[in-house]
Design a protein with these regions (language model features):
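Conserved donor-binding/catalytic core segment of Leloir-type glycosyltransferases
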Residues: 200-219, 225-228
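Short alpha-helical donor nucleotide-sugar binding micro-motif in glycosyltransferases
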Residues: 141, 268-269, 276-281
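A short, active-site helix/loop in glycosyltransferases that binds the activated sugar's phosphate group
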Residues: 138-174, 179-186
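Short hydrophobic beta-strand element within catalytic cores of glycosyltransferases
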Residues: 307-310
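Nucleotide-activated donor-binding/catalytic signature segment of Leloir-type glycosyltransferases, i.e.
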Residues: 251-269
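Conserved acidic donor-binding segment of nucleotide-sugar-dependent glycosyltransferases
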Residues: 321-322, 326-334, 342-348
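A short helix/loop element that forms part of the nucleotide-sugar donor recognition site in Leloir-type
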Residues: 185-199
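Nucleotide-sugar donor phosphate/pyrophosphate-binding loop at the beta->alpha transition
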Residues: 110-112, 119-143, 156-164
Length: 394
């Protein structure tokens, strides 16, 4: 494939710890290493950002921002690119991208929409999100030359994606999240971290990784805490890696449940240090609910050889199966507790057997080189489709 000029549009980007931004970072850096000209357009952020390699990152002061929704007018005027790659959800970014398609120079670029998850919320925020999902999101999907979905299972659970799947199936391409299987791999034990946290050598430690802020309310660490309080085996501990304004409230919940000594909050952990946390653990738990659509931390844990307990709903169940862990109903702390007890009861050898199956699956399905190859193919299809549209309109 000839080198392309690629513009990535993303609401968040490292150092913000969200999965969508980290996925954008990995694709952008990997594409630049392959010789493409890559530019990332995102909002300014605080903190130390990882090296983007040869990718150019434009951190632009937004005119305004509502949470993780920055208004950056420049996004409507991106000329001279072969591909505009929008990472959804991106409130304001989606509208500006659609506005840009009205400009002759901008609409020459193929539009690729990388769909991560629906917008969902409660109260007035939920009403706004629902309106957005019935107006802007479907319009964006109709305009896209190619739509990248995390799994067909998840796409069928979203009405406008399911409609696109039925009407124009060639426009949808499965593009799961990826994991660096060299960085996230089984390794030396994390006895140092366990000792520092006061976790006994013969105890079983479950890892939970999430940003603990209001934007990630659906991660449901409260379900994991309640499940730990209900376990039959009292030697199970929970290591929570993640910071945010909700952390203190969750710490209070653990104390109120009488398990403050078995729940260990690390606050925010840099992404590069997550492998150490996972290697210090015996298993992984993901009690998230919609709109979570995949769970990057889940495949990172599996790549480290950990068996997992995860919520059974579209997207996540495309990742975890009976050979690699246990699926439980959303919000069911009793089912989570039972799964934790079963993993504890089977001992280290049983957990290692399940973890090895997860590691094997990560190597087969989510390693970055194969995903970068697939992205090149998706871009080629999008460019061909865009050229056909331009030719028909001439």
């Amino acid at each position: 494939m000839r080198p392309l000029r690629i513009a990535h549009l993303t609401a968040t980007f490292p150092p913000y710890p969200g999965g969508a931004g980290n996925t954008c970072y990995r694709f952008a850096r990997g594409q630049a290493e392959r010789g493409h000209h890559v530019e990332v357009f995102t909002a300014t952020a605080t903190g130390e950002a990882p090296d983007p390699g040869d990718a150019i990152v434009h951190r632009i002061d937004p005119v305004m921002a509502i949470g993780n929704a920055p208004l950056i007018p420049k996004l409507a005027r991106l000329d001279s690119f072969d591909v505009v790659h929008l990472h959804y959800p991106f409130i304001f970014g989606s509208e500006l991208t659609l506005l840009g398609r009205l400009r002759r120079r901008t609409r020459r670029a193929a539009l690729v929409v990388h769909y991560k998850n629906r917008l969902m919320g409660k109260g007035p925020r939920g009403v706004m999100f629902e309106t957005y999902e019935h107006t802007v999101a479907p319009a964006l999907i109709r305009a896209a030359d190619r739509i990248l979905v995390l799994s067909p299972d998840h796409a069928r659970s979203v009405s406008y994606l399911n409609r696109a799947l039925e009407q124009t199936p060639d426009r949808l391409i499965e593009m799961p999240n990826g994991v660096d299987t060299d960085v996230f791999s089984p390794g030396a034990d994390g006895s140092g971290l366990r000792e520092r946290l006061g976790i006994p050598e013969d105890a079983v430690a479950a890892a939970f990784v999430a940003t603990l802020d209001r934007a990630h309310h659906f991660k449901r660490v409260d379900v994991a805490i309640e499940a730990l309080a209900r376990t039959r085996n009292r030697d199970i501990h929970l290591i929570v890696a993640g910071g945010g304004e909700l952390l203190d409230g969750f710490r209070s919940e653990a104390v109120a449940a009488g398990i403050g000594g078995r729940v260990h909050f690390l606050d925010r952990v840099p992404h590069g240090e997550l492998p150490d946390v996972l290697r210090a653990s015996d298993l992984f738990v993901l009690t998230t609910e919609p709109p979570e659509s995949f769970g990057i931390v889940l495949i990172e844990a599996m790549a480290c050889g950990l068996p997992a307990v995860a919520t059974d709903y579209p997207g996540v169940r495309a990742v975890l199966d009976a050979e690699t862990g246990f699926l439980v109903p959303p919000g069911d702390s009793a089912a989570v507790a039972e799964a934790l007890d079963r993993l504890d009861d089977m001992g280290a050898d049983g957990r290692a057997r399940i973890g090895a199956a997860g590691r094997s699956k990560a190597l087969r399905q989510w390693a970055w080189p194969a995903l970068l190859d697939r992205m090149d193919e998706a871009y080629a299809e999008a460019i061909e489709a865009r050229n056909a549209k331009l030719g028909a309109a001439a």
